[in-house]
Amino acid sequence: MSTGFSFGSGTLGSTTVAAGGTSTGGVFSFGTGASSNPSVGLNFGNLGSTSTPATTSAPSSGFGTGLFGSKPATGFTLGGTNTGIATTITTGLTLGTPATTSAATTGFSLGFNKPAASATPFALPITSTSASGLTLSSALTSTPAASTGFTLNNLGGTTATTTTASTGLSLGGALAGLGGSLFQSTNTGTSGLGQNALGLTLGTTAATSTAGNEGLGGIDFSSSSDKKSDKTGTRPEDSKALKDENLPPVICQDVENLQKFVKEQKQVQEEISRMSSKAMLKVQEDIKALKQLLSLAANGIQRNTLNIDKLKIETAQELKNAEIALRTQKTPPGLQHEYAAPADYFRILVQQFEVQLQQYRQQIEELENHLATQANNSHITPQDLSMAMQKIYQTFVALAAQLQSIHENVKVLKEQYLGYRKMFLGDAVDVFETRRAEAKKWQNTPRVTTGPTPFSTMPNAAAVAMAATLTQQQQPATGPQPSLGVSFGTPFGSGIGTGLQSSGLGSSNLGGFGTSSGFGCSTTGASTFGFGTTNKPSGSLSAGFGSSSTSGFNFSNPGITASAGLTFGVSNPASAGFGTGGQLLQLKKPPAGNKRGKR
């Protein structure tokens, strides 16, 4: 019986305890041998062992006597080989102990084990182990192993498929050895934070489930009827056609939202049509008045600018004259005959006086004429008016003649400029033609008409829908007609109530959504919005999700029949994805049948 603090006391062949003897380790022991009696106290190395057959003949204590000794290792050992077939319980913290065929390892163990007769330190074996506790072992098994606690498994080995249920906190999952493939087919279900290959798993196992592929509207393709084919023996009547199935609630919600949006837009249009244009006209008048005031202010600012410039020039001239007078005063009288600056000053001053006198004379004459007219009290006669109009006409003729001469000069300069560009720059392009074309384009653009009812040209929605329905009845059928709601096998025409083709979603005169650019406008020769617009035999293009003769917006194989599964416009003659469909097959009218026996 060992008491106190012992380090690696032997159990087999020692003097104190015989092989398989009865011994109890008390207090604190490190690396004691396994016995049939329970151990008391705190020990590292006999954590859960049951029995030890005496098959070896030498004790190992502590850290062992060598790395390559031929002794069984109990306790904390590094190295050690086996001389025969042993059934040993690996206890404690072991590195490189012999491998066991059926053992229960408990406690904290780092068991890099190999089979007997070939064990080397830090080997990577394949064992059938049921590990519990805190273990960092290499337990790649070919049989199902239930590991609990904290395990770091699969650090080597060359076996393949395993079926492991890992619970607790485990580092690593079922992985083939370094010599095997990294992507073996395992059946391990993990949950929480986990990876199957050398990862970290937190939590318990969960059943593996595959996410279904969902299409438009949240429909699972795996449960769809398009997987059924005639080759598997299923009957055609087992699968439902798309027109007989209810639409997904997501698409129904989208259609309801679209109808609600159209209704709101119609209400806004009605409110705009009921508004009066007096407020807009008043705003226009205010803008005109403000423009006049702005022009007056601009003219005043321009006049003041000119006056300021004139005053600057006059001030500079007066400073110059003052300097001339100062120098003239300082010049002696005998030398002033050579100084001509005063003479120039007086000459310019006389010219200014002359101009001012002429202006005064003209103003005096105008004033005398006005006073004479007021004294005579004579009114303007028709002859005077005709004479004034003739003078104004002659003035306009003279101005037109001057404008014509200027225009001819500009044309000559234009030809010279174009010739210069062609000769020196080698550019024969008429640069004035592009400007002329742009000006013409701006002139030809229609102006925005303002008024109380901008949507007055909109036709009645019910009448348009009825006309569209009658037109479609007269045309040869291009596919199955919708039975309820909106069918994606046929275009978006007359499928909902009064129809979405020519009314509501953008008729040819609807200004709110743009001219000829609605969701299904019936304009001839114009391809508008659509997920695969279809060509009807009448020549009108309507937008839809593809009719039964085109493959505009499909989610499945175009080669299958159009009545099987969830197909969006699927048919045999497949056309481009989001483009306009090709020319449809023109079906002839059916021959006149035998009317015998019919009423």
Curated annotation (Swiss-Prot):
<keyword id="KW-0813">Transport</keyword>
<keyword id="KW-0539">Nucleus</keyword>
<feature type="repeat" description="10">
    <location>
        <begin position="529"/>
        <end position="530"/>
    </location>
</feature>
<feature type="repeat" description="12">
    <location>
        <begin position="545"/>
        <end position="546"/>
    </location>
</feature>
<keyword id="KW-0597">Phosphoprotein</keyword>
<feature type="repeat" description="5">
    <location>
        <begin position="68"/>
        <end position="69"/>
    </location>
</feature>
<dbReference type="GO" id="GO:0005635">
    <property type="term" value="C:nuclear envelope"/>
</dbReference>
<dbReference type="GO" id="GO:0008139">
    <property type="term" value="F:nuclear localization sequence binding"/>
</dbReference>
<feature type="region of interest" description="14 X 2 AA repeats of F-G">
    <location>
        <begin position="7"/>
        <end position="579"/>
    </location>
</feature>
<feature type="repeat" description="8">
    <location>
        <begin position="513"/>
        <end position="514"/>
    </location>
</feature>
<keyword id="KW-0906">Nuclear pore complex</keyword>
<feature type="repeat" description="2">
    <location>
        <begin position="30"/>
        <end position="31"/>
    </location>
</feature>
<feature type="repeat" description="3">
    <location>
        <begin position="44"/>
        <end position="45"/>
    </location>
</feature>
<feature type="repeat" description="9">
    <location>
        <begin position="519"/>
        <end position="520"/>
    </location>
</feature>
<feature type="repeat" description="14">
    <location>
        <begin position="578"/>
        <end position="579"/>
    </location>
</feature>
<dbReference type="GO" id="GO:0017056">
    <property type="term" value="F:structural constituent of nuclear pore"/>
</dbReference>
<comment type="similarity">
    <text>Belongs to the NUP58 family.</text>
</comment>
<dbReference type="InterPro" id="IPR024882">
    <property type="entry name" value="NUP58/p45/49"/>
</dbReference>
<comment type="subunit">
    <text>Component of the p62 complex, a complex at least composed of NUP62, NUP54, and NUP58. Interacts with NUTF2. Interacts with SRP1-alpha and Importin p97 proteins when they are together, but not with SRP1-alpha protein alone.</text>
</comment>
<dbReference type="GO" id="GO:0005643">
    <property type="term" value="C:nuclear pore"/>
</dbReference>
<protein>
    <recommendedName>
        <fullName>Nucleoporin p58/p45</fullName>
    </recommendedName>
</protein>
<feature type="modified residue" description="Phosphothreonine">
    <location>
        <position position="331"/>
    </location>
</feature>
<feature type="coiled-coil region">
    <location>
        <begin position="314"/>
        <end position="381"/>
    </location>
</feature>
<keyword id="KW-0509">mRNA transport</keyword>
<keyword id="KW-0175">Coiled coil</keyword>
<keyword id="KW-0811">Translocation</keyword>
<keyword id="KW-0325">Glycoprotein</keyword>
<dbReference type="GO" id="GO:0051028">
    <property type="term" value="P:mRNA transport"/>
</dbReference>
<comment type="function">
    <text>Component of the nuclear pore complex, a complex required for the trafficking across the nuclear membrane.</text>
</comment>
<dbReference type="GO" id="GO:0031965">
    <property type="term" value="C:nuclear membrane"/>
</dbReference>
<feature type="repeat" description="13">
    <location>
        <begin position="568"/>
        <end position="569"/>
    </location>
</feature>
<feature type="region of interest" description="Disordered">
    <location>
        <begin position="579"/>
        <end position="599"/>
    </location>
</feature>
<feature type="repeat" description="4">
    <location>
        <begin position="63"/>
        <end position="64"/>
    </location>
</feature>
<dbReference type="GO" id="GO:0042306">
    <property type="term" value="P:regulation of protein import into nucleus"/>
</dbReference>
<keyword id="KW-0472">Membrane</keyword>
<keyword id="KW-0653">Protein transport</keyword>
<feature type="repeat" description="6">
    <location>
        <begin position="488"/>
        <end position="489"/>
    </location>
</feature>
<dbReference type="GO" id="GO:0006913">
    <property type="term" value="P:nucleocytoplasmic transport"/>
</dbReference>
<dbReference type="Pfam" id="PF15967">
    <property type="entry name" value="Nucleoporin_FG2"/>
</dbReference>
<feature type="repeat" description="7">
    <location>
        <begin position="492"/>
        <end position="493"/>
    </location>
</feature>
<feature type="repeat" description="1">
    <location>
        <begin position="7"/>
        <end position="8"/>
    </location>
</feature>
<feature type="repeat" description="11">
    <location>
        <begin position="531"/>
        <end position="532"/>
    </location>
</feature>
